[in-house]
Amino acid sequence: MKTYESNEYDVIVVGAGHAGVEAALAAARMGEKTLLLTINLDMVAFMPCNPSVGGPAKGTVVREIDALGGEMGKNIDATYIQMRMLNTGKGPAVRALRAQADKWQYHEHMKDTIENEPNLTLRQAVADELIVEDGACKGLITNTGAKYHAKSVVLTTGTAARGKIIIGELTYSSGPNNSLPSIKLPENLEKLGFKLRRFKTGTPPRVDGNTVDYSKTQEEPGDKEPRHFSYTSKDSDYLKDQMSCYMTYTNTVTHDIIRANLDRAPMFSGVIKGVGPRYCPSIEDKVVRFADKDRHQIFLEPEGRNTKEIYVGDFSTSMPEEVQLKMLHSVAGLEKAELMRPGYAIEYDVIEPWQLKHTLETKNIKHLFTAGQMNGTSGYEEAAGQGLIAGINAALSAQNKPGFTLQRDEAYIGVLIDDLVTKGTNEPYRLLTSRAEYRLLLRHDNADLRLTEKGHELGLISEERYAKFEAKKQAISRAMAAIKKVTIHPTDEVQEYLASVKQDRLNAGVSGADFLKRPRVTFDAVEKLSGQTLATDRYVKEQVEIALKYEGYIKKEKTLVDRLHRLESKKIPVDIDYNAIPSLATEARQKFEKIRPESIAQAERISGVNPADLAILTAYIQQGRIAKIKK
């Protein structure tokens, strides 16, 4: 292919999925002339799998993206068809917002945002080869021969990298949803010395909603109380005309059909070589792994207002189409369901993420960043969070400024990236609340308090929005001071209220703050019983209530964070030679050499490293006896 010189940009982003759009928008909004390349303009921010955003941990990531100035929260708030808060009966650390998306509107709204963003050019092309000179990425070459030069490049190839779709005995080269695969770029990455591996994910069948018998299912409506992902959304805009999802179950007949056809299941016949996601297994995998269960939950989710396609959630499969039909028809409510699209598995290349820095810049090629599913994660939200960080750092790199990172105590995005670059991953990585040590600090409700300041410093939060944020912080401080001054006396009204929430009687007057610390006592109750208005904004009330009720636990986590910061401050020299440190265990030495931790805190998080190895490394550095620098 003959090449030709095309335009120059500050930042080029390859791939316009959920990672790519965040990366491109961030770079452009930071003032960099940005090019966003995509294999197909009709698949910008497309949802090839579940038509939803949020859920446990993931919903918090969307709030963090919004607090930093990203787009996902605004986009889903403009295009959802249902909104629900999950885990409302549990503590604030695990509450999670989830939205059912109109997948077509989601794509169109995001594409419109990109097309109207100054500094950002959107173009359809396939990136085939990177331009690398003197260990730095200087641009790329497309399949049409165009040479684009740039100061920074971000790769977000998703599942397109040497993608292969599998449906029973049928296999063919393809990206998600039958789009073109990217073949030459992963080959080019291997030539440049990157280690790649194969992962697999899957998607369930879609059925015609007109052929579903909903009377045999359980309706799952949205919340009436206004909920939003973006801190800029207004309660008055909350959608009242929401669409319901529906729940049904597999049964022993379904499981018998699956077991009878396991010899034709690519998951078990050896056709699929890639490692699949542990936390999103196929239905055939669930039936085999959990043989004692006689049923599995299935959610029927509408894909949008202007389509009858129904996503059969938790029913991911790569069985042959005829077997998929039998499986579907055995499920209550789906006996006469007509298949519109079969489920499929897709295998694809991922980069081993330990080859990345916390900025998501690659270690062996400067100014090259990777984000999203190609880093080994699963999920739109995980991809978008990485895309935002990669885009920010690509812009900073183009400006010759220091990189931007998030610590484990600052954001779920920080936990996600640290896990990837420190531990790598042997399977598609899904963010879970259990992965965060400081999850009481990393709540869904306080993402703005944690990150808006950082977004403003980066130039991604407007002055108007920042002023509103400052006003909210001041309102929280005023409400906290006010509730501590209020006294609740043991009146008959107070005693009746306490009895209604199953709390012990009050023997003497207490401050409103101490009264609120009691289980099931609310901020509104303190206002009513004291006869005083302490705050008007429900989000301000929420912050005060959580801060007081969980004061002891939050204090405990902050003590742990102080220890983390002390260890993070103990930096490890970039060119340290671990082979020159005596007494280090072989496994620790090998892991340190491979991952090249930046601090003692990161070294501590590497699996296979024991306390003795850390003590040796720490002492060696503290004594100033830095191992010989490699020549």
From Swiss-Prot:
Its main location: cytoplasm. NAD(+) binds at residues 276-290. It is found in: Cytoplasm. Signal peptide: none annotated. Residues 203-232 are annotated as: Disordered. Residues 216-232 have a biased composition (Basic and acidic residues). The keyword Amino-acid biosynthesis does not apply. Keywords: Cytoplasm, FAD, Flavoprotein, NAD, tRNA processing. InterPro entries: FAD/NAD-bd_sf, GIDA_C_N, MnmG, MnmG-rel, MnmG-rel_CS, MnmG_C, MnmG_C_subdom, MnmG_C_subdom_sf. One of its GO terms (molecular function) is flavin adenine dinucleotide binding. Gene3D superfamilies: FAD/NAD(P)-binding domain, GidA associated domain, C-terminal subdomain, tRNA uridine 5-carboxymethylaminomethyl modification enzyme MnmG/GidA. FAD binds at residues 15-20. GO terms for biological process: tRNA methylation; tRNA wobble uridine modification. Its cofactor is FAD. Homodimer. Heterotetramer of two MnmE and two MnmG subunits. Belongs to the MnmG family. NAD-binding protein involved in the addition of a carboxymethylaminomethyl (cmnm) group at the wobble position (U34) of certain tRNAs, forming tRNA-cmnm(5)s(2)U34. This is tRNA uridine 5-carboxymethylaminomethyl modification enzyme MnmG. It comes from Lactobacillus gasseri (strain ATCC 33323 / DSM 20243 / BCRC 14619 / CIP 102991 / JCM 1131 / KCTC 3163 / NCIMB 11718 / NCTC 13722 / AM63). The gene is mnmG.
